[in-house]
């Protein structure tokens, strides 16, 4: 069973080991962390640079074996009542155990009950069907909005999704 706790500085060393190839890196980060490979220092810098912001909440999911997942919740701009998932990733060894679904459900619960959000959003790339199906399984629906990113000289289309309280 998974639990959540706030991200700690040393968590970045474990999290970056889950990003094993360039494709995974860009699906996870949209390139917001620079180029592959990502270092623990670069992830830590990105997270800690925003952690004091009252609208940015990084979490790790853990079980008895240690941390198994990571994500952030943030308020996009000045949109009150809305939080957005970002940097959602699961330890590859934990996949297939329902941990992705559990982690998202815990994050949604935090967003609605602790932070008072009425809507939670996220974006997922079309070329990431396993993540898309996981998001749908916890109740996210497409909201009709999408963006196209130029990643590795290819156009990657994102699908915006949301879940409302």
Residue ranges of predicted features:
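Acetyl-CoA-dependent GNAT
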Residues: 6-12, 17-95, 104, 110, ...
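Residue-level detector of family-conserved "landmark" positions at structurally sensitive sites
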Residues: 29, 104, 121-122, 145
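C-terminal "cap" of GNAT-fold acetyltransferases
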Residues: 83, 118-121, 125-131, 137-141, ...
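Glycine-rich phosphate-binding loop
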Residues: 98
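Alpha-helical segments that scaffold the active site and NAD(P)H-binding pocket
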Residues: 105, 136-137
